[in-house]
Amino acid sequence: MSRHFRTHTTSRLTFPSSSGGLAITRLPFSSTSSKLLLQQLSSTSPAAAATAVTITTSSPARNLQRARASAAEQGMEEHGKAAVGWAARDDSGVLSPYNFSRRAQKDDDVTIKVLYCGICHTDLHVVKNDWGNAMYPVVPGHEIVGVVTGVGAGVTKFKAGDTVGVGFFVGSCRTCDSCGKGYENYCPTMVITSNGKDYGGAATQGGFSDAIVVNEHYVLRVPAGLPLDGAAPLLCAGVTVYSPMVIHGLNAPGKHVGVVGLGGLGHVAVKFAKAFGMRVTVISTSPGKRREALEHLGADEFLVSRDAGQMAAAAGTMDGILNTVSAWHPVAPLFALMKPMAQMVFVGAPTRPLELPAYAIVPGGKGITGNCVGGIRDCQAMLDFAGEHGITAEVEVIKMDYVNTAMERLEKNDVRYRFVIDVAGSSLGGSGDDKI
């Protein structure tokens, strides 16, 4: 958008309009200072200049005062609330204090003070630009729990003081087939919470920050009684395993589900499956996780995938498998564990291509599918179910100044099972030197 305007002998002022065209307004300039003020406004805020040109010039001093007030109001509309978070500036992934502005609260927006934010493996990939799409500076975080501090005039679902959550995305078109079916998570123009672009083209910044402004449609109610630190990872990890279990019928009492991997996703999957009343077998390459799976998480069986005897004994017994592992691993042998027509759902995303010969799935009519988080309807249902059954993630709570160490540990899988940042209890710092 151009930031220049021209004055003509007819005292007409031309400046860029918010819609991309040219807006022309008559302004009888009777004061040189008014001209200078408008020039200054136009160089910093065309929209503020547009407002200022409607002021008459019968009283230059009053005009200047009103124009400055209009500029201040316009600045609030354009830049919103000052915020501070921790951002990565390059692919070193190192996070440090970062000052920026949240958008101004609109009629259908909810303003949230961030209390806790989980750290997801996706955050690690983003800050290190592992996927080549990082938009630095980037404030990570999409497992957000907080308290409502303000609502727009049109908000009907929330009020100040409500405990709420925000997950992986904060926008969708709400007109496509996926949105119509309640799967906003598959909307082709979905706006992700961090390292995305909103519909106005601005970069989205996540929950490693003190506050966030979100359209009420994408805000979730956190049930009373759930520990907020343990609830935060449910906004991503929880719905990522809950949603496909419901979609594929792996939520029926008495059915047998296999859970591959016992990490951040896997341990939550075991909790949900047991709450559904299912028979649960944890499948792992690590025999040392047996006790954790059986005694602490309540799984019914533990299967070492490298043990041919154990694999043979369990062949054809499972109604479905939820594969939560994000590292490459042999998958063909796992299909032998499933009954005919059963599905293996991938919620982890190894970067190396899977090796899957057709004979692993064709003879039994077995299927392979994937899942990415869940829609708003499923996410709220997941939180409500978690509240009823007391399900939370197993977490290690940290302060923000430990976040870089936590990222290093996460890269080594040195966490049981999720890191959660106590944002409200941290000193976020911030110098004001890098506002956007």
Swiss-Prot record:
Q: Which organism is it from?
A: Oryza sativa subsp. japonica (Rice)
**Annotated keywords:** Lignin biosynthesis, Metal-binding, NADP, Oxidoreductase, Zinc
Q: Which cofactors are required for activity?
A: Zn(2+)
- Paste the cofactor note: Binds 2 Zn(2+) ions per subunit.
Pfam families, per the entry? ADH_N, ADH_zinc_N
Which gene underlies this protein?
A: CAD8B
Recorded catalytic activity of this chain's protein: (E)-cinnamyl alcohol + NADP(+) = (E)-cinnamaldehyde + NADPH + H(+); (E)-coniferol + NADP(+) = (E)-coniferaldehyde + NADPH + H(+); (E)-sinapyl alcohol + NADP(+) = (E)-sinapaldehyde + NADPH + H(+); (E)-4-coumaroyl alcohol + NADP(+) = (E)-4-coumaraldehyde + NADPH + H(+)
Residues bound to NADP(+) are: 122, 240, 261-266, 284-289, 324, 348, 371-373
Per the UniProt entry, what is one GO biological process?
A: lignin biosynthetic process
Q: Superkingdom of this entry's organism?
A: Eukaryota
Q: Where does Zn(2+) 2 bind?
A: C173, C176, C179, C187
For this protein, the Enzyme Commission number is 1.1.1.195
What's the protein here called? Probable cinnamyl alcohol dehydrogenase 8B
Q: Which PROSITE patterns match?
A: ADH_ZINC (PS00059)
Subunit comment: Homodimer.
Which pathway is this protein assigned to? Aromatic compound metabolism; phenylpropanoid biosynthesis
**Function as written in the Swiss-Prot or TrEMBL entry:** Involved in lignin biosynthesis. Catalyzes the final step specific for the production of lignin monomers. Catalyzes the NADPH-dependent reduction of coniferaldehyde, 5-hydroxyconiferaldehyde, sinapaldehyde, 4-coumaraldehyde and caffeyl aldehyde to their respective alcohols.
GO terms (molecular function) for this protein are: cinnamyl-alcohol dehydrogenase activity; coniferyl-alcohol dehydrogenase activity; zinc ion binding
Please give the InterPro entries that the UniProt record associates with this protein: ADH-like_C, ADH-like_N, ADH_Zn_CS, CAD-like, GroES-like_sf, NAD(P)-bd_dom_sf, PKS_ER
